[in-house]
């Protein structure tokens, strides 16, 4: 039997992709619409997908030109909902598909997040995943009482401690602690409910968690840090790593780096998958899919690209000179206590650190990256399945793909994934024909 891949869909509304302007899209004056999210969940489950994923940020992007104006004008990373209550609605119309929530350990408190995710795991009968992130976004920091972001390494130190606290809390009540003995009146055995008494650099938490253990006990844990420090931190606790689509040798190299970090932590690499983020446009014909891709690219305003890239790096791209090298750009980003994003590294790989680029050229590269269209696979179901299968094998056949969100804002396009791509992968023996697990963790077992 061939190794099978997992499939997730990313429904992290950003609007910068402009697909909301296409005929049939349901993001409109009535947004948000709970019916849209329920329909997405129904279609995803009909396609036997593993996970519906929600990225998050809590501040309106304000790094570009030191203003929120272009982000508001063009819908860049806003509006964004707290998806936790919406997941309850989606879970009521499904039984198997999982839900991934994102919280930044840079600002949140572990007791709150541990309790919330435990409660949602109960509501969904064991279908919750936690995407653990740091934040490099000043707009987020400013909504949590910080004028500036903490230093990069410190953000990961805080994440390490945050996850230590969460995992201790999730295990602070034993699965058999509850008795519900009518004769004695005993609800639970106090010997099986223990304080964690955590005192650390960032948090002081007595515990225990004030809720019963959930079906998964610990939600499925996901992390996307691509830096060496991010990889080391992820290796301590993750079940799956999010990776960005790149050339197959680079995917294989990243998989090897993750495996080495897992081994250094005494963990079995075969138990941890990589979910590669991949934008696909499935059409009845290749020409139809490619026309859609080009039409969407043409609809994105330059100011929206600048706002998105500045938000994601924490560096104001509007301050760049007309010409610069990638080395100079990286120096500016680091000096601003910001974080280079993947496409800067990709450009450096293509041009060299000292290769000069004009601002217009940079923004054109940024356009295709901010919208994910630089790496979009546009074609028929068979063509996309060829690509996914090649990448799956080339990166170790452990994990799968997260199909990016522009497909999902338009239900008809999500139908193309479920009705065209999924059957093609099933014919090749690369995707399940039925859910086999009771919980998300069981369905995601690699």
Regions found by a protein language model. Name each.
Residues 1-2, 45-46, 88-95, 121-127, ...:
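Acidic (Asp/Glu)-rich catalytic clusters
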Residues 1-15, 153-216, 249-256, 260-392, ...:
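An alpha-helical appendage that flanks or caps ligand/catalytic pockets
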Residues 1-93, 216-219, 332:
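N-terminal beta1-alpha1-beta2 module of alpha/beta enzyme domains
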Residues 5-9, 52-54, 97-103, 126-132, ...:
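Hydrophobic faces of well-ordered beta-strands that scaffold small-molecule active sites
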Residues 7, 44, 48, 90, ...:
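Conserved, mostly hydrophobic/aromatic
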Residues 8, 12, 26-35, 87-98, ...:
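Hydrophobic, small-residue-rich alpha-helical packing segments that form membrane-like cores
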Residues 31-44, 223-233, 380-394:
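Short, acidic/polar
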Residues 230-247:
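A conserved active-site cap/scaffold subdomain adjacent to cofactor or substrate pockets
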